[in-house]
């Protein structure tokens, strides 16, 4: 996998919830769903290159899949990895496109 491919596959999508919305307003922390192979350095490099911002810190956690039932069949949702990315002072990522 080339370095450009790895950058594009590292950050999957922003994770939007009430908690993450509050974090982005309060202390410029953006939350992303990232690839299972990604580590802190990979996420930092990908966000800095893709969004042209300066990253101050990255915290990563694994989210376990939840048990689900489909009638008699028991299953699980897939596990995924979440990254809390704190941006440096004066930097911001605008996903909506409004100014």
Swiss-Prot record:
GO terms for cellular component: ribonucleoprotein complex; ribosome. Keywords: Ribonucleoprotein, Ribosomal protein, RNA-binding, rRNA-binding. Transmembrane segments: none annotated. One of its GO terms (molecular function) is structural constituent of ribosome. One of the early assembly proteins it binds 23S rRNA. One of the proteins that surrounds the polypeptide exit tunnel on the outside of the ribosome. Forms the main docking site for trigger factor binding to the ribosome. Part of the 50S ribosomal subunit. Contacts protein L29, and trigger factor when it is bound to the ribosome. Belongs to the universal ribosomal protein uL23 family. This is Large ribosomal subunit protein uL23. It comes from Francisella tularensis subsp. holarctica (strain LVS).
């Amino acid at each position: 996998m080339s370095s450009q491919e790895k950058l594009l596959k590292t950050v999957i999508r922003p994770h939007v919830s009430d908690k993450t919305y509050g974090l982005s307003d309060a202390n410029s922390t953006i939350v992303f769903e990232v690839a299972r192979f990604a580590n802190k350095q990979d996420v930092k490099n990908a966000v800095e290159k893709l969004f042209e911002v300066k990253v101050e810190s990255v915290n990563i956690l694994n989210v376990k899949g939840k048990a689900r039932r489909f009638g008699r069949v028991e299953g699980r949702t897939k596990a995924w990895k979440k990254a809390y990315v704190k941006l440096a002072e004066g930097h911001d990522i605008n996903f909506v496109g409004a100014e």
